Amino acid sequence: MKCIVGLGNPGKKFEMTRHNVGFLAIDRLAEKHGISLNEAKFNALMGTGRINGERVVLVKPLTYMNLSGEAVRPILDYYKIEIDDLLVIYDDLDMVPGKLRFRPKGSAGGHNGIKSLIQHLGTAEFKRLKLGIGRPPHPIKVVDWVLMNYRKDELPELNETLDNAVTAATDFVDTDWLALMNRYN
């Protein structure tokens, strides 16, 4: 079984913010594969189903970004999912908008959601799909930028990014990791 987690913040006011691109990707992935995100447990909204014939659980932690690990660890334990079968989708300030990149492991890089996951999983060696949101233009602060809604003129690029993320996450389920990185990076 695979676990695909999208990071974000719960609630209507955060729905279309840059920090919620992981949630948006999970919503679109669930829709594409007919998986209902209707199970609320372990401080997360989740749904189970099949992608490319493999069992998956899709997860949106409801703990707020900075505490994401509190939701993910119990889910992995409950379903007996190995760290190697986990993919985390999240926003990356240091990548241009529209770009996506798989990473096999790494530091938190200043991302508090990833920091929480590393703390609760006890390792930084979990797979990631980073979606670029870019750095804020001067004088906007990073904290304000990530919690800002996408502008209307940014929505076509966001939709393309989410479509690409769904394709990439779908491929994660049954594609060799090196082939996946070669294809998308």
UniProtKB/Swiss-Prot annotation:
Keyword tRNA-binding in annotation: yes
Sites where the protein binds tRNA: F14, Y64, N66, N112
The enzyme's E.C. designation: 3.1.1.29
Keyword Cell division among UniProt keywords: no
GO biological process, one term: rescue of stalled ribosome
GO molecular function: peptidyl-tRNA hydrolase activity; tRNA binding
Subunit organization: Monomer.
Name assigned to this protein: Peptidyl-tRNA hydrolase
Gene this chain is encoded by: pth
